[in-house]
């Protein structure tokens, strides 16, 4: 289930995104980005609708994924 980011407390949203960034091993090319830059990039994607917050009832967890990859069960 997609969770609207606007309904999440801003501090909680930041913490969710930071946790996501820390567990993702994304390669940012030749120049590494700071944690704050990575969080800002993901936040921008969430706010623009490119990425969505998804609640998994099976795993009882929230994940962030590209909107195009989301498949409701």
Swiss-Prot record:
InterPro entries: UPF0270 (IPR010648), YehU-like_sf (IPR036685). Transmembrane segments: none annotated. It holds the Pfam family UPF0270. Belongs to the UPF0270 family. This is UPF0270 protein SG2298.
């Amino acid at each position: 289930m997609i969770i609207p980011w606007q309904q999440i407390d801003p501090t909680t949203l930041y913490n969710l995104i930071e946790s996501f960034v820390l567990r993702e091993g994304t390669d940012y090319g030749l120049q590494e980005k700071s944690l704050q830059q990575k969080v800002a990039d993901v936040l921008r994607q969430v706010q623009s609708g490119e990425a969505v917050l998804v609640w998994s009832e099976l795993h009882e967890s929230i994940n962030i994924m590209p909107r195009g990859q989301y498949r409701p069960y």
